Amino acid sequence: VMITPNTEKYQVLHQNIEDISWISEECLIMREEGSGTRKEAGKQLRNAGINLDKLKIIASIENQETIKKSVKQGMGISIISRLAAEEEAKSGDLLTFPIPKADQGRDINLVYNKNYQMSKSAERFIKVVKEVYGIEE
């Protein structure tokens, strides 16, 4: 999703949530070059008909909490996962805009060797991932 500060300007834009053509006029804060999130954001924007060469990327930041704080403070807008923006959207700190024609997510693979003795914390992590995503053996 695209995130913006919850200001009057973006509240007005939020009324026509399907049109994000205005993104080219905004200062954009992105994840660092090479990150999976940045690659996915680029793919989703291209699918929505946005020319990536016309984007005004003002910062590349590695930490998504820093990105959210920067957006809240009005430095620019950004694209992060829906899940990462959920809390701030619920509290009203940020507005979220779905990216039109976007995929509903990306595949993340969990790979491990069943024959390798894992730590208890690794076993718990795998169990939680399987429960959350409904993965069966």
Model regions and ranges:
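Flexible hinge/capping segments at coil-to-helix
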Residues: I3-I29, E33
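Secondary-structure junction motif
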Residues: Y10, C27-G49, S119-K120, E136
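Beta-alpha-beta core module
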Residues: V12-I17, E65-K114
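Alpha-helical segments flanking ligand/cofactor-binding loops in enzyme cores
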Residues: S21, K68-K69, E123
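Active-site-adjacent beta-strand anchor residues
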Residues: M30-R31, S60, S78
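Short beta-strand-to-loop elements that line the ligand-binding cleft
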Residues: L52-N63
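A late-sequence structural motif
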Residues: F97-E137
